[in-house]
């Protein structure tokens, strides 16, 4: 199913696609939400269609979200778009035979950044308040973050021009300014377990490696999949070249991690119940 409107305005920027295995038309399935990349200024959900289809074949209901792009809006408006989609998903998930108790989310590049911050906002009210965003939370158990554009204000080609378009010209004077740093404890400690993916040829590899160190400093549950030097394995290769053997490995490993987190969460709930 494609181009389902998740907002009342019926804008092309407020639509989502749904993928499910052909051999499981009505079976309740675990859910993966996907947010496409493009540096928050480019891209569309169609770029990720083969990635989503391949993930769906592993037995998931995959929901791919479109959202507005900078400079037509600010980063905070993009967060509002994602939360509007979350609200629609929560209200309609049973219609699509999705299991809300087994829900995960993935994003690549700018989409990984957007996903990270939206999940932080829904789990940490201080971040949402500083952004002046109203979350519509979903019980996301784990994140898959591929070649994440986590940092937006470094002294590099991204940080030199993008922040004013993302956050507004005077963002450094706002309450949100401390949260532009994704290593802020309010961000890190609000996230569910994370599966990080990068590669030696990923031009944003240093972003993932720095973010991984921040997770490690806070003893946050995570896994890093870092591929060695290979000319084929560039930025977000598992999304743009989803049929590579390494892409298959990435998608399968991410799925395995999600299932591992789900099992450990369920086991913990059973142990808690038994202790009462």
Report each predicted region and the residues it spans.
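Alpha/beta-hydrolase superfamily serine-hydrolase fold, recognizing
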Residues: 1-276
């Amino acid at each position: 199913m494609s181009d389902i409107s998740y907002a009342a305005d019926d804008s092309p920027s407020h639509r989502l696609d749904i993928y499910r295995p052909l051999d499981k038309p009505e079976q309740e399935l675990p859910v993966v939400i996907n947010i496409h990349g493009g540096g928050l200024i480019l891209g569309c959900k169609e770029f990720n269609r083969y990635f989503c289809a391949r993930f769906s074949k592993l037995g998931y209901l995959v929901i791919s979200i479109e959202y507005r792009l900078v400079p037509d809006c600010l980063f905070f408006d993009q967060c509002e778009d994602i939360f509007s989609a979350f609200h629609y998903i929560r209200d309609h998930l049973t219609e699509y035979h999705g299991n809300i108790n087994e829900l995960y989310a993935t994003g690549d590049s700018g989409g990984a950044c957007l996903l990270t911050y939206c999940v932080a906002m829904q789990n940490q009210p201080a971040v949402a308040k500083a952004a002046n965003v109203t979350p519509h939370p979903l019980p996301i158990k784990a994140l898959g973050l591929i070649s994440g554009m986590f940092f937006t204000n470094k002294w590099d080609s991204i940080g030199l021009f993008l922040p004013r378009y993302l956050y507004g010209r005077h963002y450094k004077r706002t309450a949100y300014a401390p949260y532009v740093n994704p290593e802020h404890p309010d961000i890190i400690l609000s996230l569910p377990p994370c599966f990080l993916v990068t590669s030696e040829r990923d031009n944003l590899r240093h972003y993932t490696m720095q973010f991984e160190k921040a997770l490690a400093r806070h003893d946050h549950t995570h896994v890093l999949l870092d591929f060695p030097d290979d000319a084929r394995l560039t930025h977000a290769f598992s999304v743009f070249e989803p049929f590579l053997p390494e892409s298959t490995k990435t998608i399968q490993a991410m799925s395995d991690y999600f299932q591992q987190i789900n099992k450990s969460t369920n086991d913990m709930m059973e142990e808690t119940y038994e202790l009462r």
